Amino acid sequence: GPEKTILGGEQWAWLEQTLKDSDATFKLYISPTPVVGPDRKTKNDNHSNATYAHEGRRLRELLSSTRGAFVINGDRHWQYHSIDATTGLNEFGCGPASDAHAGGWKPGNRLPEHQFLRVAGGFMSVQISATKMTLQTHDVSGQVVYEHLIEAAADGE
């Protein structure tokens, strides 16, 4: 229910104020766990699952209403890019650092929110300029396996 929280009141207040005050073109919300997901139904430790559904909805709404905000997640054992169907919030999962630790999601189980799905190891890199941001997902040898470009929103958007 609404009383369940991962962030707590003090962190919520800080996050809301920081996002409001920021004049950065791009705002990276880096989370140890998914905000958009999807995640396995058996998990109950993050904002993409039913256990924290109320706070997850609130967080997705806050981030999606903040120009230039998106999520990078580090604790799923697969690489992905998902877009929340309700809010349009983008989330990028960097996956495990090694192929040996990949798993927990079936490679063929690509859901509608998945823009990219790869059950393997690697890392992410992000290049940011004043007008665009490029996120790249790499395999363990450093080869780019996925790239996504986000352009800065024009004033009034």
Give each language-model segment a name.
Residues G1-E157:
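Metal-dependent phosphoester/phosphodiester hydrolase catalytic core
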